């Protein structure tokens, strides 16, 4: 969860003191007191699809994962509720120096300072109430760094599934494409339809260096309140 990235208490206070935005979708029926902000899946993150539990794997396979990975992707991450359950990147892409990992692992590795420097600098907790909430309770998400001059010719993809009724999903995607580099990143989100309110309040921050190119595509199929 949102550890090691600034003053969580301060962001929570900002959330408590701000009014609900008067723009965007209707949030009638959403009672934040009833939203569970963290739901841990019944597995740790795996690097092999065969090791993902069958019930979770079945959900993603109906949506074309990992078939898409085998055919046309440089790497795939799959998040189930609040944490990633699968993450893998092609060896030839990793050998180019491309970093594609989950946010928690990025915070523990050699790119931790880079994550801290860029986290919630484009989307600030003071932007609106749900940005502050995201900063306080975020979990999961992807970190991507493409070094100078590196061109990733096939896309990377992260997929987020919110499956628990009454839950919120607060993944954070942070992509840094350095000078002269090139990347296409695809992100997908989905959730089943429930008769209770769910909340999706993820955050995406994209940093593109001089003469670099980033194409970011998002595909969503959400039957819930999306901020």
Task: Please provide the spans of the model-predicted regions.
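Glycine-rich and polybasic anion-binding loops at the starts of cofactor/ligand-binding domains
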Residues: 3-225
